[in-house]
Every structure is written in C-alpha cells, then in structure tokens.
Amino acid sequence: VRIRMPIEDKLSDKNLLTKLLKYDYLINFVNSKTDVYKLSEFVGEIVRDFKPGIYNAVHSNPLSTKEVVEILKDYNLVNEKWNFIPYDELDIKANRSNCVLSNHKSSTVFNFDWGDEEVYLRLNASLIEKRKEWKNEL
C-alpha cells in the first residue's frame, strides 16, 4: 500500500497540514494525499478480502499547495509568513518530489471509494480548527 502526504485531524509531525503551517516558504506543486482515517478503512477492506498487489492509497482530484493553503485559511489555520517561491529558490537539503498517483487499481479491485481530496482536507482542517477553539475554552 502506497500513501502520499498523509493528512489527519491532529497536528502531528507527519501531517501535511502541520508541515504547511510550520513552513514559511512554500512551492506550488500538485501532489496526491492520503487521509489516514480513510486509509484505515481501506486496510480493513484488504484484510476482509486480500488480493496481493501494489495499491495507491490516495484521494481523487489532487490539489496544489496553493489550493490547500486556501482551504486552511478558510478554517483560520494560517501562517502569516507564508510566501510562495520558485522551487529553485527553496533552501533545501534534499530534492522534493511532486507525485500524482492513480487510485484506479485500489478503487476497482476493492470497489473502494477514495472520495475527493478537497472534502478530506476540509474535514481535517475543520476538526483542527474546532480542537483549537475547545482548548481556548478550557
């Protein structure tokens, strides 16, 4: 099972949304993403009806970094220092990859609906926003 850029409703170190909030300089690539809760549903399908193979566990209709940032802004998840720069200006130690994977095989072999990427990004962002509000109320 292959995943790309995991997203979830917790601000964990591996969560793409956490990473974007921490970075000041961003590049605008389109990449596939994987909601970790939807991934667990998919793994359940594999367990129930195992069929060997390599399966891409990613959502349909991948979004660009700019589109993801706009969604985060809709939920008051913002880094005021965000600045989109060309890839060659990014100060990095290792090259970055941009990768769009097809979920066709995982969808058809297991009759699994990965759903639209934007829906899962909005769901996770809204839960993070609510969690921040709850902490402020305590």
Annotated model-derived regions:
Residues 107, 111-138:
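Amphipathic terminal alpha-helices
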Residues 15-19, 25, 38-45, 67-71, ...:
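Alpha-helical elements of Rossmann-like donor-binding domains used by nucleotide-donor carbohydrate transfer enzymes
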Residues 2-3, 59, 102:
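A secondary-structure boundary/capping signal
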Residues 36, 65, 113-117:
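Amphipathic alpha-helical segment in the mid-to-C-terminal domain
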Residues 42-98, 129-137:
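Mid/C-terminal beta-alpha module of Rossmann-like enzyme folds, strongest
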Residues 1, 26-27, 57, 85, ...:
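Hydrophobic residues at beta-strand termini and immediately following loops
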Residues 1-38:
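NAD(P)-dependent short-chain dehydrogenase/reductase
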Residues 31-34, 63, 101:
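Residue-level signal for the nucleotide or nucleotide-sugar donor/cofactor binding architecture
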